[in-house]
Design a protein with these regions (language model features):
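Domain-terminus/edge residues, biased toward the C-terminal soluble/receptor-binding domains
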Residues: 60-61, 72-77, 81-208
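Active-site-adjacent loops and short helices of periplasmic peptidoglycan-processing enzymes
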Residues: 1-81, 90-93
Length: 208
């Protein structure tokens, strides 16, 4: 991998596919992403095709994946809205939700069996903000600092996305504090009250 971070896999070493997920989510391992792509689809190109199919399925309309790791390519792009949709979808998977909430993971290698490596989560928001439940950092020279995160308070889960933001930790905290303060539920008990509420990314365009 020409640029970026790694979980530092070596030729001949063996780990579980779930360990590659840990390497990606904790250490931002580009090598882990590429290894997973080869294992699942046979090549990064074919895996990226599957990524695009899933993106379309969940309503990501301004995204095109070219590299499994997220490293720069002229045709590799997304938007804050699409990343929020992806994070919301991913959090529905219990394995992902549990993994992204961890501050560190220790990987026990299959080969060599004696090797164990601890990987710390790059997402500092887990330590800086008590309501943070997970997220993913990202950085390249072209994209700058990018952060997708989630937080839960009083039964309400929110997702926040910033792109090319040098002050991402503080900005996410400020945005969450504002959103949680302003959010309120409405108990509709009046049988005469009825309205169509528009939805984004759902099975229907609106609910009544």
């Amino acid at each position: 991998v020409a640029e970026g971070s790694s979980m530092y896999l070596k030729v001949g070493e063996k780990v579980r596919l779930s360990d590659l997920a840990s390497g990606m989510m904790m250490a931002s391992g580009n090598d882990a992403a590429n290894a997973a792509a080869y294992t699942i689809s046979g090549s990064p190109e074919k895996f990226s095709q599957r990524m695009n199919e899933k993106a379309k399925q969940i309503g990501m309309t301004n995204t095109n994946f070219v590299t499994p790791s997220g490293l720069d390519d002229d045709n590799h792009y997304s938007s804050a809205k699409d990343m929020a949709l992806l994070m919301s979808y991913a959090l529905e998977n219990d394995d992902f939700a549990n993994l992204t909430a961890k501050k560190s993971v220790t990987v026990e290698f299959l080969e060599p069996k004696s090797k164990k490596t601890a990987y710390a989560n790059h997402n500092r928001l887990l330590s800086l903000y008590p309501y943070c439940t997970g997220g993913k950092t990202g950085y390249t020279t072209a994209a700058g600092r990018c952060l997708v995160s989630s937080a839960k308070k009083d039964g309400v889960t929110l997702v926040c996305v910033t792109l090319n933001d040098r002050n991402d930790w503080n900005d996410h905290i400020s945005l969450y504090d504002y959103a949680f303060e302003k959010y309120r539920g409405v108990d509709c008990k009046d049988a005469d009250f009825c309205a169509d509420i528009p939805c984004v990314g759902g099975d229907k365009d609106s609910v009544t």
